[in-house]
């Protein structure tokens, strides 16, 4: 788990949420550097959450951000299970409906930005509503 120095100079452990938030900020900056535009972060819809919503041209990009210290158990990308994909699809469907859209009317895709150790992997169109 990442650490941050306290005022006294001794490190304290970050919570899982703080660590996740920090990697989401890193992913946002990295994607913006690749030309995507930020729309929203930590979008909650009926119990599901989407880490980032970005735009690439006319495409709405729903982004799941994952971090693992090592690839020992498959790395960060491998942690996006079918169950997690289903929850992301449902959350995106609800978000689109709230914004007067649907998978039929809005060009969108689901990407994963996976940080494993110091490596970053951007998996465009990692899964879709037909998976």
UniProtKB/Swiss-Prot annotation:
Gene3D superfamilies: 3.40.1350.10
Bias (Polar residues): 1-19
One annotated GO molecular function: nucleic acid binding
InterPro entries, A to Z: Restrct_endonuc-II-like, tRNA_endonuc-like_dom_sf, UPF0102_YraN-like
Region (Disordered): 1-20
Family: Belongs to the UPF0102 family.
HAMAP family: UPF0102
Protein name: UPF0102 protein YraN
Native source species: Escherichia fergusonii (strain ATCC 35469 / DSM 13698 / CCUG 18766 / IAM 14443 / JCM 21226 / LMG 7866 / NBRC 102419 / NCTC 12128 / CDC 0568-73)
